[in-house]
Amino acid sequence: MFDLGWTEMLVIGIVALIVIGPKDLPVMFRTIGQFVGKAKGMAREFSRAMNDAAADSGVNDVTKSLKAAVNPVNTAMDSVKSAASDLGKFDPESETGKLAADKAERAQNAKKIQAATARAAADRKLKEAQEAQARASELEAAVTPPEKNET
């Protein structure tokens, strides 16, 4: 507190013993201790009152927002850390996990439906192409005269 070493305190104690005397020295130390205790209590009370006044006026919120504005990297890292911790807490047996599993199953079923639809469309186009080729063959046969046998 006063930045005194052991040797300085020893010298002060010896001087106090000589000046005050051994009879009154314990009473003086007790009085000094009570005074220091009261001073520390008053300092604590003053500090607590100042902190309460700062909290009531919203200074703490302003301080937090200023610190966040000064160092946005920490703010971003805090959100990343919280997201990572949320992912670590993921429980597949929870309602959210069940919904995620249902969503994945629906996505897989949608892909199966799309594949089946594409296959059906390809089969339909193939059938239409075969029918068109057969019709073209019939029309070509009707247009082309039959070959004559020359004997």
Curated annotation (Swiss-Prot):
Subcellular location: Cell inner membrane
The protein's assembly and partners: The Tat system comprises two distinct complexes: a TatABC complex, containing multiple copies of TatA, TatB and TatC subunits, and a separate TatA complex, containing only TatA subunits. Substrates initially bind to the TatABC complex, which probably triggers association of the separate TatA complex to form the active translocon.
Its biological purpose: Part of the twin-arginine translocation (Tat) system that transports large folded proteins containing a characteristic twin-arginine motif in their signal peptide across membranes. Together with TatC, TatB is part of a receptor directly interacting with Tat signal peptides. TatB may form an oligomeric binding site that transiently accommodates folded Tat precursor proteins before their translocation.
Family recorded in the similarity comment: Belongs to the TatB family.
Keywords: Cell inner membrane, Cell membrane, Membrane, Protein transport, Translocation, Transmembrane, Transmembrane helix, Transport
GO CC terms in record: TAT protein transport complex
Name recorded for this polypeptide: Sec-independent protein translocase protein TatB
Membrane disposition: Single-pass membrane protein
Biological process, per Gene Ontology: protein transport by the Tat complex
Transmembrane segments: 1-21
UniProt keyword Protein transport present: yes
InterPro entries attached to this UniProt entry: TatA/B/E, TatB
HAMAP family registered for this protein in UniProt: TatB (MF_00237)
Superkingdom classification of source: Bacteria
